[in-house]
């Protein structure tokens, strides 16, 4: 009988986001082998032992272990959550220089192992650090993916679902652009249980005043959570789980991940959150959502915000 290749995932970064992602992956048994790498070796040992103790009660992978960058040599997916954390009052883009230096080191060591799989990046500012990862790794754009606006989209669906009294799964809505202050809601394509939002507002004008508030709640959610408890991690961990399943199980899902534009939306040479087909080969196709004039202007502004930052990143490579 022909051997079936096991799915191997390496997580780099065992902080709050990383350990939450590890728990979600192990609980759902998404990987056959799950390896955790972090400079805090005692923390990793503790988490590995803790996760292994839960194996009898979950759909766990057959192997959960502490490892090193050498373990990336035959990994299908490397997920990087490592990096300096976002502090209260600090924007994601404030983190650029220090996390770029961290990523140059991490990605360089991963590539030295012989890694030839897919990168999934979740450290902030995620669009910029995904760009850095592509630049350092030299891998094709399809195999370097950022978490993008997948969490923002989930927050948006949650807010809309709560407003209209339906499950978020019955909301068709997207946040695109930078995972940060310049992101935008694609209101023109938003539907609630199959009905266009604008049509709903015509018959429910009292809802109109809530629309901007819903977007602001979505955009600023991270700051609210950080102020309340210091960091966000459960939501993004679930988003990373969703992306990982799309890759490892070849699900062909369209997700608002951070993808590399090469002319799509009239822009290029930038990683940004856009609807993208994700499967075993990575981020294989970008879908150009129809945007109205206002949304197009906002998206182009988001591109410029990110390009201004990547210009400073490029200088760090000179």
From Swiss-Prot:
- Name this protein carries in UniProt: L-lactate dehydrogenase
Top-rank lineage group of the source organism: Bacteria
Q: Which GO terms describe its molecular function?
A: L-lactate dehydrogenase activity
Please list the reactions this protein catalyses.
Answer: (S)-lactate + NAD(+) = pyruvate + NADH + H(+)
Similarity remark: Belongs to the LDH/MDH superfamily. LDH family.
Output the lineage of the source organism: Bacteria, Bacillati, Bacillota, Bacilli, Bacillales
Decide whether keyword Cytoplasm is in the record.
Answer: yes
Q: Where is the active site?
A: 179
Keywords from the UniProt entry? Cytoplasm, NAD, Oxidoreductase, Phosphoprotein
Pathway linked to the protein: Fermentation; pyruvate fermentation to lactate; (S)-lactate from pyruvate: step 1/1
Keyword Metal-binding on this protein? Answer: no
Q: Where does NAD(+) bind?
A: 17, 38, 43, 69, 83-84, 105, 122-124, 147
- Subunit description: Homotetramer.
Q: InterPro entries this protein is in?
A: L-lactate/malate_DH, L-lactate_DH, L-lactate_DH_AS, Lactate/malate_DH_C, Lactate/malate_DH_N, Lactate_DH/Glyco_Ohase_4_C, NAD(P)-bd_dom_sf
Q: Where in the cell is it found?
A: Cytoplasm
Role description: Catalyzes the conversion of lactate to pyruvate.
Listed EC numbers: 1.1.1.27
Q: What is its main location?
A: cytoplasm
Question: What PANTHER family does this protein map onto?
Answer: L-2-HYDROXYCARBOXYLATE DEHYDROGENASE (NAD(P)(+)), L-LACTATE DEHYDROGENASE
Query: Which residues hold substrate?
Result: 86, 92, 124-127, 152-155, 232
Enzymatic class: oxidoreductase
Which residues are modified to Phosphotyrosine? 223
Alphabetical list of CDD domains matching this protein: HicDH_like (cd05291)
* GO biological process, alphabetically ordered: glycolytic process; lactate metabolic process
């Amino acid at each position: 009988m022909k051997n079936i290749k096991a799915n191997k995932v390496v997580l780099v970064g065992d902080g709050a986001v990383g350990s939450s992602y590890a728990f979600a992956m192990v609980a759902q048994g998404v990987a056959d082998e799950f390896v955790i790498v972090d400079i805090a070796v005692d923390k990793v040992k503790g988490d590995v032992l803790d996760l292994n103790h839960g194996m009898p009660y979950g759909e766990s992978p057959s192997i959960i272990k502490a490892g090193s960058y050498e373990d990336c040599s035959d990994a299908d997916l490397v997920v990087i959550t490592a990096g300096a954390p976002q502090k209260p009052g600090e924007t994601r883009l404030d983190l650029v220089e220090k996390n770029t230096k961290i990523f140059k080191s991490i990605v360089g060591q991963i590539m030295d192992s012989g890694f030839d799989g897919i990168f999934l990046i979740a450290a902030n500012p995620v669009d910029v650090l995904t760009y850095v990862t592509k630049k350092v790794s030299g891998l094709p754009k399809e195999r370097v993916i950022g978490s993008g606006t997948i969490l923002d989209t989930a927050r948006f669906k949650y807010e809309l679902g709560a407003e209209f009294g339906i499950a978020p799964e019955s909301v068709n809505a997207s946040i695109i652009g930078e995972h940060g202050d310049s992101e935008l809601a694609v209101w023109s394509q938003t539907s609630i249980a199959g009905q266009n939002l604008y049509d709903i507002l015509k018959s429910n004008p009292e809802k109109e005043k809530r629309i901007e508030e819903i977007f602001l709640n979505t955009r600023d959610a991270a700051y609210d959570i950080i102020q309340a408890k210091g960091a966000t991690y459960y939501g993004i961990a679930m988003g990373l789980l969703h992306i990982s399943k799309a890759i490892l199980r070849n699900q062909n899902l369209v997700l608002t991940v951070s993808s590399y534009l090469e002319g799509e939306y009239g822009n290029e040479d930038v990683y940004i959150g856009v609807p993208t087909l994700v499967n075993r080969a990575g981020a294989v196709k970008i879908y150009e959502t129809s945007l109205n004039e206002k949304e197009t202007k906002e998206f182009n502004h988001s591109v410029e915000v990110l390009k201004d930052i990547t210009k400073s990143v490029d200088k760090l490579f000179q």
